[in-house]
Amino acid sequence: MSENKTYTECSINGICSINNAISSLHEVVLLHIKNLAFYILKLKDFGITNDLIKADVTNILYGVFINAAYSQAEYNEITTNLDKYTSQSIYLYEKYCRENNLEIEKPNRKVKKTYNIINAIRTGEKSSLKKYKSLSPEQKNTYEIVYFLCRSIVIKIVELQRLGIDYKDAYYSVLEIINSCELSGFCFDNIKDIFDKSIGVYLELMKLIFATEKKLFGKIEEVDIDTSSYEGKSILVSGSNLKALQEILEQTVDSGINVYTHGFDMLVAHTLPEISKYTHLKGHFSTNRHNYIADFSTFRGPILMSRVYMENIDFLYRGRLFSQDPYVSKGIEKITNDDYSSLINATSQAMGFKKYNQRTSIHAGFDEEKILEATDEILEKLKSNRIKYLYVIGICNCEQDNSYYEDLLNNLPDKSYAFSFSYNKSSNNIYHINSLYDGRLFLKIFRNIEEYKDKNISVFMTQGDRYTVANLLTIKHLGFKHVFSDNFPDNIIAPNTKEILKNKFNINFITDVKSDIEKTMY
């Protein structure tokens, strides 16, 4: 049995555990959104939409899915607005139905208006308990997978919006799922078409994000990313908001302030010419991919961050943290309207780095044309049956159990070939692709996957993060014959979720190389 050796702070310290009170509040908020979703979708069918409601509901959903904590005032504002939107939507829906002689439909659900945060927690606890008691283990775990997909879509919606693009279909896709998931008699088969459509929406969101980044910041270049720290005042930009990074760099030109990136998703910034051109973008500050606690505690300046990545450790650094999240914890300063002046001004109170600290560099980026030329040639051989089995190791560069994949690549069957994204090995039948730290190059290589759906292609997912479940579902949705996942820690894929992925979605989990290769040969 191969085990994934990548453990995060979540699995070691439990810092990503969910507070029951916060979880209960989120349950109540989702009940309000569920009631509203019914009417928003009905009005959409009539051609009636409201962008202000869409923007607010998206922010509220984002807060739920990043596990945001609410103050009493924030909770009141959220539920009051949702109730107001529901009343407005009911009025417009019923008015349209009466004017057009249509039957007025109503959702088979009631939402208790609860504005006191203590009472709301109790209501949320009761709803969660009802869910726990009314659903079978299989139903509960399938419900969780649906929740994971919604979470991934909403986070991607916000990432795309921060790049200036609004993909409305994704918003309505999430509302369709929320509206369709009834606890009473929950049956996945009843929502399968909506679920499959939503996977396609998630895929389209990823493609739009990658295409928009290329349009805004230029074509990816190969670079060596410095991980050293330099003497002087500094700002750390963590997360995935490249527009925020670019704006901070622009506002700190000739200020003497050094800027560093942080986190897996920010590595791409250094490969994009419209960002890397700033000479005071000094490098990437990270001691380890997952080590937020150590990195933030040793950084000598203010930090722009998001709870998408850190969950429950933000309280450790209050006073130095800034965020663009719609809901932030007490002591974290909220950035609005792209005004980073408070973040920049905070460098004057920070220590800054007193001396140069040299570290190794990270090679990143790729020559897209060169790689596509090589992979297209291999895929043509697969198409003409000169290659019988194609193995894809990872969809991007990331950490993995090297011994398993080394053994796998050393024991490929006859007439096979491998694209290795995450394990650095090349030979006559192995092409190592030094991609970036996301799936953009993977999607480019298999841009014409329809031509190869009848071919024997096996994809091994080696990256464990908040998108792992959605990415596994997407790869399966694209039509790859065999999909394997590494054995990630329970905070990435819980054991019960793993069973549903295996039994309902036909996703394999690696065991031993010999057995897994045998599975790929039919």
Language model: regions and residue ranges:
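Anaerobic metallocofactor- and corrinoid-dependent redox/one-carbon enzyme cores
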Residues: S2-D51, A55, L102, R109, ...
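Electropositive, gly/pro-rich neighborhoods at or near active sites that engage anionic ligands
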Residues: I33, I40-K219
